[in-house]
Amino acid sequence: MWSFYVFSVLYFIGGVRSAIDERLKDDFFHIYKNAAIETRDIQNRPVTEDQVTFYLYTNENPKEFTAIDSNNLERFRNFTNQIVFLIHGWTNSRKSEWLENMKNAFLVRDKNSFVIIVDWEDPANQLYYVSSINTYDVGKFIAKLLVNLYKNYGVDKRNFLIVGHSLGGQVAGFIGKQFKKQTLQSLPRIIALDPAGPLFTTRPLNERLNKDDADVVEVVHTNGGTFGFLDACGTIDFFVNGGSSQPGCKRIDLADLVGSVQEPLLCDHRRSWAYFTEALLNPTEMVAQKCNSWAEYKISYCDKVTVPMGDLNTTLTGSFYLKTNKEPPYSKKLSSGFSLSRLISY
């Protein structure tokens, strides 16, 4: 519970980015980064490679996993199908329900794919500001596996797909940076599901998820300004229901934080993976429309460019908006009303 209060205070500090200049942002970032590292050292809990583990699932037996490391990668040699890496967020582990559901969705979507659930439970279950710093090392260790598969086992980089939620979305950014640093090649696609915002909004670009971390950086925003990153930070950003709060989730004042409200407080944040799992299973639904803002989307003052959120091949760029239902199925038909932008152009 203490870590939850710390998280809330640090979020407030990190959220004043509009009131401080870039130099102050950098100063704040380095202060908290050094404090987090010192806390980690005092606790004698540095991130080690054995704290980042990998669990492979295939359609041969989708309920059973194979733990993999550098000693048993032969089955990946010259593998030509998609390899999906799923990465959890703060205080989670590989046993998180959303990972199981999304793993199954990917295996249904592509029966020949491999899905690897990444577990970084110990580094993720520390004070939030320490776990936020741990994302760099976790990303580095995951990237090491990808580079090994790419350089030594003939896996085409185009087969890699990285999906992360919350702090896992920020981990995904560090994977992309490290892969590019070690291979001089970009990963094809990163999908960040409501990537963590607190203590990342004030970071320089090289210290957080950004659009240069892969050829396509797809971001799904559902709780921006609270637990998620508020602003566009990918090559394509989906702002679901405006990107900050979700229908069907209870509105709670942060001043009322007590143990009993932690679950509903996280509802908006968790909708990102619920929406994306549904989009995977229904790839022609969850259609979003390109628009300059949520306000303009609501009055149909938008371009006619649309894309389903479950399109894993899109190279479209920009900000896209969509509405959902309060409960599953979340997909809502895109309005067929007239476009004010087209009307005004006549």
Positions of PLM-derived features:
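Short beta-alpha junctions and helix-cap segments that line functional grooves
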Residues: 168, 202-205
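Flexible, membrane-associating and regulatory peripheral segments of lipid-active enzymes
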Residues: 2-117, 123-134, 144-157, 182-185, ...
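Hydrolases whose catalytic domains are alpha/beta-hydrolase-1, hotdog thioesterase
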Residues: 171-175
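Conserved alpha/beta-hydrolase "nucleophile elbow" surrounding the catalytic nucleophile
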Residues: 88, 160-169, 193
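Active-site nucleophile loop of the alpha/beta-hydrolase fold
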Residues: 188-199, 221-225, 243
